[in-house]
């Protein structure tokens, strides 16, 4: 009978650690890397590069989009930091959990139970906080997507050859070209006529087509950004669903852990399974924290 109790306890405890580890591993390998933030950083810089290529109305929308993308990134990394903090707690507690197997007794078993419940409880709390941050991040992406639709409409109007913005750009080009022609004349009035004729040919044959191409490049950039933002929002929504499933699983195993008797006679295989699960989660935490800048890894107890 004692052996059956021990096996049941091992199964519950091992499941508790593995469930928490699974949630962290999911965050580490999927949720935390779902958005290509390096690409987004470059994109945000690109927003400023085109600031001379759209109207004031479009400029306001671009400013709003930039703020929303930066807000989304802030909230996403806020979620990352929350999980980082959980890792810091987990490595310390699981190390203590492993060491408590030495000269095992009922008091140490009770301490182990408290440790696992603390890890699971803190996990639910921290992952829920991360979930809220991801929700806000997703909302900012969604709002940015709406602004990008409005921007596309604005740019379509601006870049129409009949628009006041397009005509103002053409007028600027003409003014600069004719000013250059006048400054370069050396052959009197007839030279001026010839220079203006050349300037007119350059304007209509080269400069205006170049303007059209340049403005098309700007619109294509924002069309591409719109698709990227929509995909990012979709990916975060999928990430939130996965995380919600993991949080629910931790909550369920926490309830089972709370009602499990911990003080049983473990054989060597059982001890190996439990220590192995704990060490694996410590390594997962180390991997996560290292990827987020921690230089010194937590040393896994060699027992």
From Swiss-Prot:
Primary site of residence: secreted
Membrane topology reported for the UniProt record: Single-pass membrane protein
Intrachain disulfide bonds: 87-285
GO-annotated molecular function: pore-forming activity; toxin activity
Keyword Transmembrane helix among UniProt keywords: yes
NCBIfam families (alphabetical): PRK11376.1
General function of this protein: Toxin, which has some hemolytic activity towards mammalian cells. Acts by forming a pore-like structure upon contact with mammalian cells.
Identification of the protein by name: Hemolysin E
